[in-house]
Amino acid sequence: MKIEKVHIKNVKGIKDLELSFKKDDKILDVIVLAGVNGSGKTTILESIKDFFNNKNINYDEPEKSNANLDIFLEEFEKKNIEEAKKKSDYFKGKSKLSDFFNALHLYSFDKNIKNASYEIQIEKYFKIPPKIIYVPANNNFGEVETETSTLLRDYEFINTVDSELMEDIPSYIATRRNYLATIEEDLTMKEITNKVVDEINGIFNILELDVKLKGFSKDEKTMPIFENSAGEEFDINDLSSGEKQLFLRTLSIKMLEPKNSIILIDEPELSLHPKWQQRIIEVYKKIGENNQIIIATHSPHILGSVSSENIFILYREENGKIEAKTGDELYSSYGQPIDRVLKDIMGLESVRTPKIEKDLEELRKLVDEDKYDTKEFKEKYSELLEILGNTDEDLFLIDMDVKIKQKVNSNVESK
C-alpha cells in the first residue's frame, strides 16, 4: 500500500495543497518534505496519519474532506480485499477502501469478532496487514530495560513511535533471541546471540558506527550490551544522545515489522552527526519490505542523499498560500555538495554568516570600482583574512580579480 496523491485543505496553515507522489508511472518509495518553519511539513505528516485514523474525512464526498489521499494498492492487495469481501457476511454490494481501513482498525482493537466478519477475513488473507507508522520529532528518551523475553505485540493499524513503545526495545531484542532459539534448534545459544547481533548491526552497517551491539548482560535483566572501538562496554542507557536517538527510533520501527506499510518520520536528523544524516534514509529503507517512507526535514545532508524527484520544497506565497516545488522545478540534488543544496534546493542566499557575506560583497564591489588600492579595501581585506584565513576560496577569487584588474589597468596605462 502506498500513497499516490495527497490533497489537504484548511488544515492549520495549509489552505489548499496537492502533492503527487507518482513520477513516470511509478509511485515514489521515498518522499522528502523540506521548507522553512511553518511551511506545513509536520502538518502534512499528521494529516496523512489522521486520514487513516478517520479524522477530517468525508468518505461519501471525499472532495469535501480536509485531507484526502489517493491510495495505490498492489495487485495482491486488491485480490486479498476482494476475497475477504466474498467470504464475509457483511457486504452485499460494492465495498469502499474506507471499509478496508475500518477493518484494520477494528481488528486492532477487537480480537473477539466473529469468524465470518470482514475483519477476520482481512486478517486471514493478509498474513501481515499494512501499517501506518508515525515517528514524531519530539520524543523523551527515558531509561529502558528488559521487562520480558517473551514480548507479544498485537497488530495495530496506526502506530506512533513514542517513549512507551521505545521502552520495549530491550524486551524485543531478548524476545528475538528466544524466538530464534526455538526455530534454530541445532545452534548453540552463543550462535543464536551472534545471529541476533549481526541482524541488528547489519541495519546500521552503512553508518560505520563506532558503537555496535555486542550481546546481552549476564544477569537476569539480559540488557543489550554495546561495545565501542576502544573495547569499552555499556548498556543502551549509556549511549550518547545521538546514538540513543538512532538506535531507539530505528529499532522501534523494526520492532513493528513493517511490510507494504507507510512510515512517516518527522525530523530524522535530530541529534545525528552529519555523516549519519547523509545515510539515514538508506538505513530506514533496509527495514521491512516494500514500504513507503515520507520524511519531513531541515537537513541539507538528507536532501543531498536523494534525487530531486523525491524532494518537495514547501514555501509560502505572498498571499499566504503554501505551495511546493519538486522534480524539474528544482536543481539536481543527489550527490551535490551541501553548500549547493543549501543554495539551489533550500533557497539560502549564502552559506556564510550574513555579516561575513556582506563584507565580502563590499570587497567585490570595491574591486569592480577599481578601488583595490584604497585604505578602505586594504582594511576590510585584512580583517577578513584574519577571520577566514589565507585558504578561503572567496578571498582567493577576490585576489585573482585584483591581479586581473591590475594587469588590465597596467596595459591600458602603457598604451
State where each predicted segment sits.
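Switch/communication elements of ASCE P-loop NTPase nucleotide-binding domains
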Residues: 1-58, 217-355
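Acidic, Mg2+-coordinating catalytic modules of nucleic-acid enzymes
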Residues: 25-27, 124-126, 131, 143, ...
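Conserved P-loop NTP-binding catalytic core
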Residues: 46-114
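Solvent-exposed, amphipathic alpha-helical segments
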Residues: 51, 172, 179-182, 359-369
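Coupling/switch segment of ABC-type P-loop NTPase heads
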Residues: 89-208, 342
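Generic structural signal for hydrophobic residues
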Residues: 196-200, 280, 337-338, 380
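A short acidic/basic microdomain associated with nuclease active sites
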Residues: 211-215
